[in-house]
Amino acid sequence: MTAPLSLFVTGTDTEIGKTFVSAAMLHGFARHGLRAAALKPVAAGAYQRDGVWRNEDADQLDAAANVVLPPELRTPFLLKAPAAPHIVAAQEGVTLDLDTIVACHREALTRADVVVVEGVGGFRVPLNDTQDTADLAVALGLPVVLVVGIRLGCISHALLTADAIRQRGLALAGWVANHVDPAMSFADENVATIRDWLAREHRAPLVGRIAHMTPAAPESAAAMLDIAALVESLRAARP
């Protein structure tokens, strides 16, 4: 039996389409014949429906997955206010515990062929007084896929984040160019520069380039991802 795959999705910033790309990957994995599940371990920003607290990002992931995990497993820490998680957690009296997330991930791996773990915000977002999302990725021991929001400043943001990933001893399994600014000048040149630098310095392949979409359509975006290349990279990144 083939061991399940898993990856940690991070971004160069917040609001650069991390959930959108994660959902697209879930659709892509399903088309690749894999049972695909999602974890959104920490979500900040909740709304109530039918007396149940929910999160829009988690809803999008559930809609894209062909294996839907129970909410308490998919998102063990659902915070109500849409703000920095360590601030909201302190206000709500919640301790964001990495061991709990690791246990949820371990259980998720028994239910799917591939588990997409979406982080919160960028690569180094504090979760408590001493740990951040980079520590979470390390605790999970997962290869990382970096979503780069293609807009002004994206080259520096991409290279800095890739360096931070390597400094934590993690493999950068690939990156996705997500065109968040349709009016950006020299978008092709920016993508080419990031592609060349990340390939040379990190051996990280470009596994997708997603055009600007209004409204966002993860199922359509899945066709813009090279899922076969991503699966190969994830397998190569296994310890």
Curated annotation (Swiss-Prot):
It comes from Burkholderia cenocepacia (strain ATCC BAA-245 / DSM 16553 / LMG 16656 / NCTC 13227 / J2315 / CF5610) (Burkholderia cepacia (strain J2315)). ATP binds at E15, I16, G17, K18, T19, F20, D57, E118, G119, V120, G121, N178, H179. Keywords: ATP-binding, Biotin biosynthesis, Cytoplasm, Ligase, Magnesium, Metal-binding, Nucleotide-binding. Mg(2+) binds at T19, D57, E118. Its cofactor is Mg(2+). This is ATP-dependent dethiobiotin synthetase BioD. Its EC number is 6.3.3.3. Homodimer. Belongs to the dethiobiotin synthetase family. Its main location: cytoplasm.
